Amino acid sequence: MIREERLLKVLRAPHVSEKASTAMEKSNAIVLKVAKDATKAEIKAAVQKLFEVEVEGVNTLLVKGKTKRHGQRIGRRSDWKKAYVTLKEGQNMDFIGGAE
């Protein structure tokens, strides 16, 4: 069993993009920014506990940070982890339902 304190640190924010909204419509998957050291089991447990939905599967990927310039200085954004969480049939989760 994963401690509740860890579950709260696993999920960072929903990732809103055109690809994410297409994934939600076609395969009932939500896209989340998660902690870089989070495992698939931790992500699944956190989503099920915090949002009270049934999770079918979790796919993760590391997103490389972009190189950015500010004048002559060159910097790099941090790498981050993205998770595609597929919900079971009949389950629904709406992050932006109130924005109309």
UniProtKB/Swiss-Prot annotation:
UniProt keyword list:
Ribonucleoprotein, Ribosomal protein, RNA-binding, rRNA-binding
The reply to whether ATP-binding figures as a keyword in the UniProt entry is no
GO function term, MF aspect, one = rRNA binding
Its domain of life reads Bacteria
Biological process, per Gene Ontology: translation
Q: Keyword rRNA-binding: yes or no?
A: yes
User: Which InterPro entries does this entry report, sorted A to Z?
Assistant: Nucleotide-bd_a/b_plait_sf, Ribosomal_uL23-like, Ribosomal_uL23/eL15/eS24_sf, Ribosomal_uL23_CS
Q: Which Pfam families match?
A: Ribosomal_L23
GO CC terms for this protein? ribonucleoprotein complex; ribosome
* Classification via SUPFAM superfamilies: Ribosomal proteins S24e, L23 and L15e
The record describes the protein's role as: One of the early assembly proteins it binds 23S rRNA. One of the proteins that surrounds the polypeptide exit tunnel on the outside of the ribosome. Forms the main docking site for trigger factor binding to the ribosome.
Question: What is known about its subunit structure?
Answer: Part of the 50S ribosomal subunit. Contacts protein L29, and trigger factor when it is bound to the ribosome.
What the record says about family reads: Belongs to the universal ribosomal protein uL23 family.
Q: Which PANTHER family match?
A: 60S RIBOSOMAL PROTEIN L23A
Q: What is this protein called?
A: Large ribosomal subunit protein uL23
